């Protein structure tokens, strides 16, 4: 590495010495050499002698002019162009060259298949031209694109199309104008040949907006669901938040080579094709719902992210936490609120809590960053959304919406901070959030311990609630947080007991603000069964000594669907922890009859929503289970999880088969009732696959071959792989033969291969690096094969001999120079070495030291490796 990357600190923020009000861009496009001309209107705000320091990387400078005169008062440094002796107001003209085809990092302007496209968030615009690449510089963009018409018939950018024309030699040009000032991370350009799905949306004020969805030629029949999702998003944002779209056109382009999921560029969203393309035979129910969610997320950014952006990147959760909350609400309003909440909580418990306990622990508003791309995290996004949800819980929907309106009134068209958002919520609601603000600055997962006491003589029930947040890699000292803690109390017949104190009703959301607090409730005539942390009202770990009877009672009687699922999770957690300890001592699995009976009751409950039943019957993932332990034993977890599956499969075989047969559907519809039935049926098939082999093999093979949709086909294939059924290899080969030319569909196959419990899985993964459908230059392929192996097959990745670690080192060595952003995502399982036993830690540390010694180690990897080794 040439020099050690330097950290940036939130407290060092200062406004820029110069602002750019308008920028006129011209691109003379060619994959090998593109000429960029940037004409900026600049104004000095700093000291008269302050130089203009522009960001730029991998650029070839051609010329600089100030007010049309050639300018020589400048110098180039690594990553910067410093221009001196400037007047207070001036026009700056910079011409430079770039090579999109050589840009394998996929930041800035790059080649995706035969198309050219951009990705500028967080700091990609500096790979296009020299500029003030920071989010607090908002300018109006005009963009002219010139290109060969046969290669690039469509030339797209932000805003509205204002002019176009033909040129000699088969070339043409299009000019775009975006009337809304924006930071350069929201700039976008796409050039290519596409099929286009067109539609319109009429806003509530009566404006007609043109909707255009661009997909690769031949994929038009996979675009309609994305268009439906976009129109639903636009309607929902008007109805729920009162927010209307503001341009004449809204475009989405699907590209195959993309580091992230999607990007909210103003008026021109660029999407990973994974979150656009869907057809019954290529996409699962989950794919359809993910497309709906991500289309919604990027559309909702038009107001929460674009119209109001971030002052600096430390404030990223201002737009992302808020917009994830909005997309979660969108999915919940359109679908099943309980199932969506369960999905969000699985992510928090299985993945975000692990991030809090890792060397990369940070608050939702980080204080220190080396590489900004490393902070597009579950903490900033998902925990950030939980913080917004807590504000919503404390204020209520009406006051929350008043806060949103005030936030837009104050900050529309500007760059704001997290404090600005909280202040707007406070001022609109008159609710004091000063203590609550600690959620923005304190990292880690709070542990809330609850003890209860019932006094039959006074008919009082008391909860003693204490909180502590363990020290994290970035913060040793922790303070008590303001935790909204939702509860319900049930009598022995399953009725909710009204909460009272001193003759007055008590809010079911308790405000826990101290290290320890006591809450007493009157007129409780029987020992109640408590439902605690209802709806996961705060992102905390809960400690309470549940009895099995309490949990099975809640599974049956809780009026809140989330509480029913959560009780099942707690019941499973009890016996998973017990059996991991037994496994480590060489003892067999132990599961009391009443646990299986509790799950049998779910299967026999005719009133339960099938989607909820499926969630209750889905065992926690290996990653969720890992969070139950201080020291993770991945092999014991995998073996106990499989033994538990086989035990339930044997105990409930008749019920699983009956429910499986009862939920057959002839037609495929993306309908929440049908999705629930398919999910339940496939959850049953998963258990049946671990039952009697001959029946399992027959059922799975038949479902795979009879399936008229990808959901059922993939569920069968996944069951065959998980249970290692005799039909596995034949079915996997059939899938490969049918779909090998479709990368997105093959990603599902690569994930099944790389997460297989087979002993030779690493050997298989190594072999698949040479598969005809695999490419080390495509992030989706890399994530589905290498990423899934390292992140979702812990038993194989953490093999005792260290072979999994060595494999990842080899892959990261390649990706370090090819695509540092993707490399940085893949290293996550390796940096969490302190959660494992000494022998594994030693091997993981050696692997990290090996990577640290790489020549030209990227800043992305350097930051994570040095924190892990600290």
PLM features per residue range, with description:
Residues 95-198, 561-564:
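Extended, low-hydrophobicity, Ser/Thr/Pro/Gly-biased non-transmembrane segments
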Residues 350, 377, 522-870:
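Long, ordered, helix-rich scaffold segments
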Residues 45-112, 133, 168-170, 174, ...:
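A surface-exposed beta-strand-loop module
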Residues 1-35, 110-119, 131, 135, ...:
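N-terminal, polar/Ser/Thr-rich
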Residues 37-42, 56, 88-103, 141-149, ...:
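Short, hydrophobic/aromatic-enriched beta-strand segments in well-ordered soluble domains
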Residues 176, 204-458, 462-463:
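Hydrophobic alpha-helical and helix-loop surface patches within well-folded domains
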Residues 37-58, 130-133, 139-148, 419, ...:
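Surface-exposed beta-strand/loop patches in extracellular or lumenal glycoproteins
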Residues 60-67, 432-435, 445-532, 577, ...:
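Beta-strand-rich binding/interaction modules
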